[in-house]
Amino acid sequence: MGMSDIMWLDVSWAWLVLTAVLLAAAVFYLYTLILSHLAKTTVRNKVVLITDSLSTVGNECAKLFHAGGARLILCGSNWEKLEALAEQLTSQSDPTLTFPPKLVELDFSDMESVPEVISEILECFCCLDVLVFNSSMKLKAPVHSLSLQMDRLLMDVNYFGPITLVKGFLPSLISRRSGHILLVNSIQGKLAMPFRTTYAASKHAVQAFFECLRAEVQEYGITVSTINHTFIKTSSSIPKDEITARSMKTDHRQTPLGVSPKDVATELLRTLSSKKKEILMARWVPKAALYVRSLFPNLFFAIMAARVSNTVAETPDD
C-alpha cells in the first residue's frame, strides 16, 4: 500500500467521523425541537400543580412546564424561595407566551394547614388539569435509632400529605371527567432497603394508594401515573478534599446509578403526553434487584443481610 493510499484512507476516516458527529448533532437538535413542541402542546393553557417545587426535580418541572405555557401552581414550604423561583421563571420567558405562576405555601409536616391550601387553590382555579406529587422527605438510619415522632413526620410528608391533597381535588376532577395525576415516587416504593425502614414504608404506602386510585378513577377519564426513580443525582454536600471511597458508597448522589432532576422532569412531560401508567427510571442494577426480589426472594434477603453486616463492620468505633 502506497503513501497515497494511506492518505486517502485517513481522509476517508476523517470524513466518516465528521459525518457521524454531524449526524449525532442533527439528531440531538431534532430531539430538542420535538421536546419543545411536545411541551407546548402537552401543557399549554393547562392548570398544573407541583408540590415541593423548590426541590431539584420540582424546580426542573417548573422550568419545563412554564416554558410550555402551563398555568403553574407552585407549592413549597418557604415563601421567599418560592418568590425567587417565580422571579427566575418570569425573567427568563416571554410574557406573551407564558403565565405568571401562582405561589402557594404548603408544608405537609403541618397537616392542619392542608385543607386551607386546597380551598385557596380551588377559589383561584375552579379546576386543575395536572397534579404532580413530588414531595418527599428522605431519611437513612437504623430502625432502633428512629423515634415514633420521626416516623409520623415521614408518613405525613410522604404519604398523608399527598393523599389528603388528592382527595381534596378529586371531586372537581371527577365532575369534569378529566385530569392527570402523577406521583414522583422512589424505587423504594417497590424495593425496600436496609436503614430506610420508615422511608421505604411511606413509599410503599403511597405507591399502593395511587395504584388503587388508578383503577377507581379510570371510568371518570382520569389518568394516574407513577414514576419510580433511583437516587437523584445532585451536587454533593461533601467537600472535594474530603471525598473518600467510603463516602462515595454512602453518598448516592455521586453514584452512576442515579438519575438527573432534568431527566425526571423530561420523563414527566413524556408521561403526560403518552398517558403511560407506570415508569421505572433505573439502570440495570436496580432493575435486576427487582427481578431477584420477585424470583429469588431468599437470595435477595441474604444479599440485604450481607450489606448490613458489611456496613456495621465498616463503621468505626466512636
Curated annotation (Swiss-Prot):
GO terms for molecular function: oxidoreductase activity, acting on the CH-OH group of donors, NAD or NADP as acceptor. GO terms for cellular component: extracellular region. Substrate binds at residue 186. Its EC number is 1.1.-.-. NAD(+) binds at residues 49-73. Putative oxidoreductase. This is Dehydrogenase/reductase SDR family member 7C-B. It comes from Danio rerio (Zebrafish). The lineage of its organism: Eukaryota, Metazoa, Chordata, Craniata, Vertebrata.
